[in-house]
Each structure stands twice: as C-alpha cells, then as structure tokens.
C-alpha cells in the first residue's frame, strides 16, 4: 500500500497499531480523529499529506523529520480548542516549499492552520518554504523557535497566541507581511 485514501481511518476507535511501511501519500481526512495507540508510518518517506489528514489523531511521532515531503495541506496535523494536539514536539520540513496536495474537485487547496493547536510543539523548521500559510502555527503555546530562512510572504495569524515564542528566523527578505501575524506572541525578542 503506497496511498491511504480519503477518510480511510476517520474516527477509528480502539486500534492498537496501524503499520503501513510503504505509504507515500496520505489523502485528506485519512486518519482524522482516529484513536490509534501506535501509528507506524514511514514519516521520512511521505511525499504528500492532505487536508486534515491527521487532525485530531493519536499515535503520532513526537519528532518527525519529513525528509521527502513536498505537499502539505490545510489542517494536516491541527488540533482544536477542545482537542489539542499534544504529541508533536519538533517538526522538520527540509523540502517543503509551500505546495499543497491537490486531490481533485471539491477539495480546498488552502494550506492554512496546518499545525494549529499543536500545543506541545517547541520548534519548527522549513528551510525551503517561501510563504507562511495563514494560521500555520496558531495557538502553538509551547513553540520557542521557528526557522524559515527563505520566506518572503507572511500571512495572517501565523504565530498568533504562540506565547512562548522567542525567536523567529525569516531570513530578512520579506516582501509581504500581513496584519496580526504574531498577535499575543509577546516573548519574541529576535525577528
């Protein structure tokens, strides 16, 4: 199996382990709100992750390095105000430039809120990313450092309520900075 299709495990309950060692694509809502003790995927081999693919899911790794990921869509790992993602600690996206996973008609290619409400996330880096999507790290209250050296556009709400964020590396070539991109991120000392 190289592709997990739309909604495949949405809302699944009481699964002890899901092991899919050859997966390259995870389509939208594939694991949304799935209660899985261990989600064994080749995180470093994934190439595309769709809309809300892992939103509200359990069994996620703490420190994934998405070595081959080139497409990432809206809400992929997001929590909510009532169901926060407390699993992810660090995120590395070495190849992602900002592309989303196009999954056909009826699917939004918006890439906002990807890690919203990931309240245990402490650091994120995406060295090739050029545009920070809206609300990408909204309410990531443990976030301390964000590294995006090639970013030129920062959309709204990216760092809102990141109350422990102290350092943002944007590389110094910003051409567009949206309003309210870091509301209540009051500890930022370097930008």
Where do the language-model regions lie?
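Structural signature of tandem-repeat unit edges
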Residues: 1-3, 13-25, 34-48, 58-71, ...
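Consensus positions within tandem repeat domains that build extended binding/scaffold surfaces
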Residues: 5-10, 27-30, 50-53, 73-78, ...
């Amino acid at each position: 199996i190289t592709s997990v299709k739309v909604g495949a495990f949405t809302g699944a309950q009481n699964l002890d382990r899901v092991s899919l060692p050859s997966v390259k694509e995870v389509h939208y809502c594939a694991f949304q709100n799935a209660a899985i003790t261990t989600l064994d995927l080749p995180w470093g081999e994934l190439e595309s992750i769709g809309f809300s693919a892992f939103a509200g899911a359990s069994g996620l790794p703490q420190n994934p390095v998405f070595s081959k990921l080139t497409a990432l869509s809206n809400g992929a790992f997001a929590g909510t105000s009532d169901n926060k993602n407390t699993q992810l600690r660090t995120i590395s996206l070495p190849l992602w430039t900002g592309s989303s996973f196009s999954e056909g008609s009826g699917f939004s290619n918006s890439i906002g809120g990807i890690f919203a409400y990931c309240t245990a996330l402490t650091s994120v880096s995406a060295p090739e990313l050029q545009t920070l999507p809206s609300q990408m790290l909204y309410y990531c209250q443990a976030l301390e450092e964000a590294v995006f050296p090639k970013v030129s556009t920062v959309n709204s709400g990216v760092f809102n309520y990141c109350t422990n964020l102290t350092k943002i590396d944007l590389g110094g070539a910003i051409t567009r900075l949206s309003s309210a991109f870091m509301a209540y991120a009051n500890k930022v000392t370097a930008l």
